[in-house]
């Protein structure tokens, strides 16, 4: 374990003393540090009346137990504090450590010892070995009662709301859209979980089209074959129009007011929401139009879908109507809500957070968007090509519609509405235009970057630099396009398409607690969070602070002095093997074992580089045909320690999200010896070589120059590292698998790579 603490708010000695006293610790400024430490320890033994015995189980040095020490006349030393602090945080002497000073240095322990009250205060805010902060562990053990009132420590809300007395209710929010032309405004089902309290409370909202169920068989049947011919496109310039977001018309309802009349017993929850539920935040889960319990069509990513989530925030602020049932005869008021909302969730869920933020909806104070899509074209297409998300060849937006249109899982809904749904789905399948892979109005209507200037909320993004599902370009684009007037924060980790709130190496939960206590509960805690926090790829459990995602300087590296050819065609056996399992293709590609058609360029580095942003390939090429795919990957190649991309369990169910509530595993990315690491990649239709909206003809055997931007990353490279560039045509994981007989020739003497860095790095 190594500490990377971003959540602690520096506290003065007097303030620390008052907070400790407020928690019930019997401290006294007139007493010695030794006496105050003993009082602190005895009060911490919440489940033991025999505190002498508890003290006797702690040690203050390699030979003395704490009870003996406190009965002696020995002075308190720094070494004594170090031994005790480590034990309070769950580290075991003679097992986890023998030399506390060296061990504390190794784990980057953040606590100082200048003042006993400041020191104990900071200690309480530190995570233990199990992942829980000491204060959270003590509250769970009974330091404070679950009295359904707010209590704070170091600017963060504590788990003092009773999760055994939760209110679970369902309401149906009306939106001013009729997405299936039914003659009525659509209704959106909202599942609410909230503590029983006299306070008006803020809301953690997860907008999840998955939460009311998914239709895997329908999606599997809709999934496309990737084998086919790459189209030769007619030259043209694509025209699109940005449509203003339409604010819905709001009419106060005159219906009688009623409490919610529908309840539920269980819904799959997001554990970060659970963490805040025990701290006085309501949790709501909304699946939006076209899902089970709601009405309407699954419009998949456009602002109609976004509006179905926005209406829920408007209801929390008293602006639109929610009904007790589909009868629409009684309305429900959100009289428990303070109107302030934070959205949460990963992937599609985080995507809806971004879309919501771009509406500028009142009441949305914070989005915590993890691995979020910023424009749907970049999820299912790339540079004029159909480009499946990593791991899901053949998926497309209409496949996702089939997966998430959960109304068809309700038989009565199916027989009434499936014909209309199928007609709308067919229209969607035509609009996505798999034949050309081009950008069009349909995709433009699902591009949140066009409305990013409307964002008013505070923004938190997390993204994996090994996420080839929702690729890093999504967060790179939106984060750098956000208005300068807002506060924004970005956590970039070395994993794939995963959550990071339950990792051992970073206090993400506690940082979000400080931020949301500030923004949603109005606590003036002076919390400041850095803009870009990046997981260092060279060292285990180490996070660094950077000024920006994207460097201000370009380093140029030549690619060679010869001309090399890439053949697209494979014999039938090889082609069928790669189509059957794209992982076999990737393995052969990365090994460079002459089984795949590729150009491999090894670039031994002559100095250190902190790669920060989008690498670009500047290539002089010619093709033998009027069509061609060019794919590229950049690898850090050669044996050394690197991160795996999926976190593994450190301790099972050790993370407590309240008082023994919604426990989950503590995780971390393994750091092990490996042969290579993909840094970046990309694919390009050579007919889209100038920009996305320009289609150009290819003249066979005529040289032309291209600039090819790859996926952005932040990656530390060292002198002597081998940077491997692989150029090839068909990517069997991502692109159309066209086995046509064409080739691409690259003039390496006229080609080079640019690496984005910070000036002086």
Swiss-Prot record:
Q: Which UniProt keywords apply?
A: Aminopeptidase, Cytoplasm, Hydrolase, Protease, Serine protease
* One Gene Ontology term, aspect cellular component: cytoplasm
Disulphide-bonded residues: none
User: What InterPro entries has UniProt attached to this entry?
Assistant: AB_hydrolase_fold, Galactose-bd-like_sf, Pept_S15_Xpro, PepX_N_dom, PepX_N_dom_sf, Xaa-Pro-like_dom, Xaa-Pro_dipept_C, Xaa-Pro_dipeptidyl-ppase/CocE
Q: Where is the active site?
A: 347 (charge relay system), 467 (charge relay system), 497 (charge relay system)
GO BP annotations listed:
proteolysis
Q: Which reaction does it catalyse?
A: Hydrolyzes Xaa-Pro-|- bonds to release unblocked, N-terminal dipeptides from substrates including Ala-Pro-|-p-nitroanilide and (sequentially) Tyr-Pro-|-Phe-Pro-|-Gly-Pro-|-Ile
* A GO MF label: dipeptidyl-peptidase activity
Q: Does the keyword Cell membrane apply?
A: no
What Enzyme Commission number(s) appear in the record? 3.4.14.11
Query: Key word Protease present in the record?
Result: yes
> Which cell locations does it reside in?
Cytoplasm
Q: How does it assemble?
A: Homodimer.
User: Which HAMAP family does this one have?
Assistant: Aminopeptidase_S15 (MF_00698)
Q: Which NCBIfam families match?
A: PRK05371.1-4
Q: What does this protein do?
A: Removes N-terminal dipeptides sequentially from polypeptides having unsubstituted N-termini provided that the penultimate residue is proline.
Record-stated family:
Belongs to the peptidase S15 family.
* Designated name of the protein: Xaa-Pro dipeptidyl-peptidase
- Please report the organism this UniProt entry assigns to the protein: Streptococcus agalactiae serotype III (strain NEM316)
